[in-house]
Amino acid sequence: YKRQIYFASLGISGYLAYYFIDSYLCLIFFFIYGTIWAFSVSNWHETVHRTAFKTRWLNEIVYHISCFMGDFEAYRWRWSHTFHHSNTYQTKDDYDHDIQITRPTELLAFFLNFIPFADLLFPHKLLKYEIIKNSFRKLSPVIAITAPDSEKNKIVWNSRFYVFLWLVIIAYSFWIGSILPVIYILLPNYYGKPIQFFVNVTQHLGAPFDKKDHRESTYSVKINPIFAFLYCCLLYTSDA
């Protein structure tokens, strides 16, 4: 029922943004809507581990929906996340592509995460850009490291499916003469990211480097109930 509340909250905030479209209030509700949308990354994380629901098929459905929402191509990220859990903070040899903060830390890029739309200043770093490249079979290095050859065609064709849906949304916006479909579906990750990033970046804070023993990578955080709900209550964790 918690994920039902999540999607209901997304729908209600989206409706209120549209209802107040002629008022500055719409900016507040779009920010709320974008923030809830951006937290789809938490749904993605719990469903890839199949801990959100009791049944595998329901986890799989919500996983694919959340992947599309968060620009996480489903097959690429299933394998890269498996690789991520083979180690703690991995700094040697093959790099862990699931870690949000680079080493050495790019401070400008880090702080820009707290500014809406700042990601668009670096289009070559966007997940959408990676998906577009993958759709042309120009597979990213992380795929070569983590995904078996048998999965690469799935990554290519699913990337093409994502790009097709994006083009349909853009074409529909032109057809109806409104940018709203783009604002509602293609841009929320960019204007709704600041709070989501602030919460999500706690996920690996304090983890030791290059340790196979995941018992050394436990952590606890405390956040308010609303953010905890959006974060799927990922507050007490062993990174295993």
Regions found by a protein language model. Give the residues of each.
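Transmembrane alpha-helical segments that form the membrane-embedded catalytic/substrate-channel core
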Residues: T35-W44, E73, L186-D210
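His-Asp-centered metal-binding catalytic motifs of divalent-metal-dependent phosphohydrolases/nucleases
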Residues: W44-R50
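Membrane-anchoring hydrophobic segments
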Residues: R50-T51, R56
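Cytosolic juxtamembrane regulatory segments of multi-pass membrane proteins
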Residues: T218-L234
